[in-house]
C-alpha cells in the first residue's frame, strides 16, 4: 500500500533541500541526485514507493518544488546547503509577498528579510500562498508587500524558483511595506 503523497513529498523536500547525505545521496553542484537513488532512499522509510509515484508527486506539485531532468531530480528552491541554481530571472513582477509571524515584524522592518538558514529569501506571487506559508511558523501572521522594482534598483535579482515562488538574496527594509 502506498503512503500518502503528502508524506512522501515532505520527506523528498527534507532529503533534497537539507539532508541528502543522511540518506547516502551526493548532490551535484546544481543539487541534482539520481532519481533511482532518491527512490531507494525514500524506500528506507516508505518501502512501497516507486519511481512512478515520485514522478507523479513532481507532476502534481502545485508549488513546483521539484524538477526532473532525465534520470535526475532536485528541489528547485529551499536548500540549506550551497547549490548553483540556473533559474530564470523574473523581470516582470511588480509586487511580491511574504507572510511572517507578527513577532518578527519589528526586526524585519528594521533589518529587512534575510535568508536565515537557507540560500535565499522566499517570496510569493500570491498573497494567499504567502499567508499560508507564514502560518507554518505561527498563527498571527502579517503580510509583507515587497516592491520588486525596488529590489531591482538595488541590484538584487529576483528568480523564478517555482510556479508562484520567487527567490532573492535578501530584501532591504526600504523595499518592504506592511499590508494593512
From Swiss-Prot:
It is an enzyme of class 2 (transferase). Keywords: NAD, Transferase. Its EC number is 2.7.1.-. Removes the 2'-phosphate from RNA via an intermediate in which the phosphate is ADP-ribosylated by NAD followed by a presumed transesterification to release the RNA and generate ADP-ribose 1''-2''-cyclic phosphate (APPR>P). May function as an ADP-ribosylase. This is Probable RNA 2'-phosphotransferase. NCBIfam families: PRK00819.1-2. One of its GO terms (molecular function) is tRNA 2'-phosphotransferase activity. Belongs to the KptA/TPT1 family. InterPro entries: Ptrans_KptA/Tpt1, RNA_2'-PTrans_C, RNA_2'-PTrans_KptA, RNA_2'-PTrans_N. The keyword Transferase applies. GO terms for biological process: tRNA splicing, via endonucleolytic cleavage and ligation. Pfam families: PTS_2-RNA. The keyword Phosphoprotein does not apply.
